[in-house]
Amino acid sequence: NLAVTLANMGCKVGVLDADIYGPSIPTMFDMEGARPMSVQVNGKSKMEPIENYGVKVLSIGFFTKPDQAVVWRGPMAAKALNQMIFDAAWGELDFLLIDLPPGTGDIHLSIVQSLPLTGAVVISTPQNVALADAKKGIAMFQQDSINVPVLGIVENMSYFSPAELPDNKYYIFGKKGAEYLAKDKEVPFLGGLPLVQSIREAADVGRPAVLQDQSSLAAHFD
C-alpha cells in the first residue's frame, strides 16, 4: 500500500521482496506465476522487474512454485538477494522499498552491507511475542556497526471494530504495545492500522486496499 501510494504521487518506486523463505509480495501485487524477462543494459544481461500498479517488483517468489519450499543456507540466500539487487534493471528510482522477514539474521545483514539504507520502518502487532522481535530489530539497526536510522514504528492490527458497532474498539492483541515500544526506544510512533477484513481480502487477491475507495485503509494514505 505504501509503494502504490508513492507511485500514485508520481514517484518512481521499486519493491524488493527480501523475505527469501516466505515471499508474499507476488500474491499481494497480483503477480503470481509471473517470470522476469532478461534485458540488455549497457551490454550486460539483467533481470527486468515486473511492474504492476506503477511499481517495479522483484521477488524470489517469481522463480519458485507456490508450494515449493526454499531451503537454503545463509550464503545462498544472500547471493540470490544480491542478484535481485545488482543484476536487475531497476532503472532510476525515487524509492526502493525492501520487505524484510521478521527478526534478525543473514538476510538483514546482507541488505545493510550491500545498500546504503536511508532508514527502516519497523512493523509490529501489539502483543508481547511480536514486540520482542520488533525490539531486536530496532536494536540491530541501532548498532554502531550498522547504524541505520529507525524512521518509526507502525502498529498493525491495533484493534478491531465490528461493522455493526463501528464506534467500539476491541484490542484483541493488546493495547498500544508498539506505541509504548516507540516511546521506550525513543523513535517516532507512526500510527496504528486496525484489523479490517477488507484489507486482508485485498492482499489475498492482489488488489492493494489503498486503491479501493471504500477501504478504511485508504483514509490513512490521503
Regions found by a protein language model. Give the residues of each.
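Phosphate-binding loop that captures ATP/GTP phosphates
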Residues: 6, 11-67
